[in-house]
Amino acid sequence: MTEYDYEELGLVAGLEIHQQLDTATKLFCDCPTTIREPEESDRSFTRYLHPTKSELGEIDEAALEESMVDREFEYLAYDTTCLVEEDDEPPHRVDREAMETTLEIAQLLDMSVADQVNIMRKIVVDGSNTTGFQRSMLVANDGAIETSAGPVGVEDMLLEEESCQRIEETEDGVRFSLDRLGIPLVEIGTKPDISSPEQAREAAERIGMLLRSTGKVKRGLGTIRQDVNVSIEEGARIELKGVQSLDDIDDLVRNEVRRQVELLDIAEELAERGATVGEPQDVTEVFEDTDSGVIEGALSSGGKVQGLLLSGFDGLVGREIQPDRRLGTELSDHAKRHGAGGIFHTDELPAYGVTEAEVEALRDAVGAGSEDAVAIVADDPETAELAIDAVAERAETALAGVPEETRDANEDATSRYLRPLPGAARMYPETDVPPVEPDVTEVETPELLTEKVDRYESEFDLGSGLAEQVAYGQRWPLFEALVAGEGVDPTLAAGTLESTLTELRRDDVPVENLTDKHLQGAILLVDGGDVPREGMEDLLTALAENPSLTAEEAVEQEGLGGVDESEVRDAVAEVVERHEDQVAEEGMGAFSALMGECMGALRGKADGDTVSDVLRSEIQKRA
């Protein structure tokens, strides 16, 4: 990956971190914050959404473009959702637990809390909210975090309702699920103080650590999302949305910088060529006898082929601007936003069943010369016209350089066009929910995870790796209850909650069935000597596969209770006698091979030290 002098390019970046809060109920109703499977839905309904004007009488550009795509939105409802999510009942008051957690986060970020929190409506007509807007409130501003490259300011923090979960595209539009709608969500926006890809990742990791330090945020895929705003001096501000993994942030910034540098180079070359963008025209006749499956499929359904002359663009439409993405990919993204499957262009033709003769005929039809390129869209007449107009508009912006826009992060740390940047015209006041006056007097600042790691090392004598696993994991409250409250050996508790559960998960044991009560019971039995340490995996496996059992019942069912030394000696002697020739020949050299067999014979009913001592004794008798 190309590395640039980011200071010379004038790289400026900022973050927006969206984190779901782990509250009992949703932000504006009493429904649980439980994620459901689509198959569990007991009813559904459909909506069409349209943008409304802001309080200043303006319509947001991003919302307007979204509304131009005519789509039906279907919503799956459940027995854990209500009329508030369906927009058939007014919202209730702001959830108290969500506000208290938000105030804790504000303290960790050293932010100033607003005297009065007013709820606003943010226009969103992509179907992700049944109302056509998202409720949002500014709770705090003006904070800061530290990074190795210097401080990064925190501009603001908002408490919002999470959007619907997108399930799938349908023939008429999009299917959404209401289970996620309304889960409390904090949005933390930094100031544009970030000047390198590495600092962007470090800042995101720092904020993520602070959020998890509260112990009141949801964990797992989709519960935290990062948006990254990136610009370079001669480029434009780009909002990169939906980054799921912190590991991708630095590469995403690098790839966006490369994209802007390449687009600026293309714009410079287009200017030198005197490039222009022509008017779309119907070129269906060129492809009447085509062997291209895509084009023939469109025409056989009554479709058309629209062409666009890109004067001076030859060789540039196919130029790579990000890994495996080209200027032509950018044009195609805009066509796709209007329902087309994509575009073909002459930098990649002949291909896809389009012949050399058809390419020449296409060039003749639009009057293209040797330095020109041609883009085409094949689809139903209306879609083809909308899509080719969008391609022409994006090609025009290529003449100027880098357009401001919102882009969607891809899994490979590249990005694709999503919509124009939203503006202030998307906000207006919420009239159904009264303002909130936050009370910060009783808010306690939680212990940071980094501080917790240090404490576990010093207080419980855990190694740094294990201490970090426990502190950053989800079971640290149980760990502390066992060690501080029950006097359990810290290494046993930590090793079980982290290492043992990880090993069982890799062996496809359903550890998600294990509750804190299961784990506490198992650890107490082992710590008390009722079950040998070697029996822990078998005990937890039994509980995971039969979660209705208690730890004591699982021990009895699996026969995991400890055995006395005479039973150990009998089992070990039997193993040694089966291998008497090997013992006679190798002596103590046979120890390792026989130890595993002895432990297997005892099925975790005796600890390893006892078995080891007895085995050594039995070998020495016979050697």
UniProtKB/Swiss-Prot annotation:
The reaction(s) this protein catalyses: L-glutamyl-tRNA(Gln) + L-glutamine + ATP + H2O = L-glutaminyl-tRNA(Gln) + L-glutamate + ADP + phosphate + H(+)
Gene Ontology molecular function: any one: ATP binding
Sequence similarity: Belongs to the GatB/GatE family. GatE subfamily.
UniProt keyword list: ATP-binding, Ligase, Nucleotide-binding, Protein biosynthesis
Cellular component per GO, a single term: cytoplasm
NCBIfam families on file: gatE_arch, PRK04028.1
Principal EC category: ligase
Function: Allows the formation of correctly charged Gln-tRNA(Gln) through the transamidation of misacylated Glu-tRNA(Gln) in organisms which lack glutaminyl-tRNA synthetase. The reaction takes place in the presence of glutamine and ATP through an activated gamma-phospho-Glu-tRNA(Gln). The GatDE system is specific for glutamate and does not act on aspartate.
Protein name: Glutamyl-tRNA(Gln) amidotransferase subunit E
HAMAP family found in the cross-reference section: GatE
The EC number(s) this enzyme carries: 6.3.5.-
GO terms, biological process: glutaminyl-tRNAGln biosynthesis via transamidation; translation
Organism: Haloarcula marismortui (strain ATCC 43049 / DSM 3752 / JCM 8966 / VKM B-1809)
Gene behind this protein: gatE
Subunit architecture: Heterodimer of GatD and GatE.
Keyword Protein biosynthesis annotated: yes
SUPFAM superfamilies documented for this protein: GAD domain-like, GatB/YqeY motif, Glutamine synthetase/guanido kinase
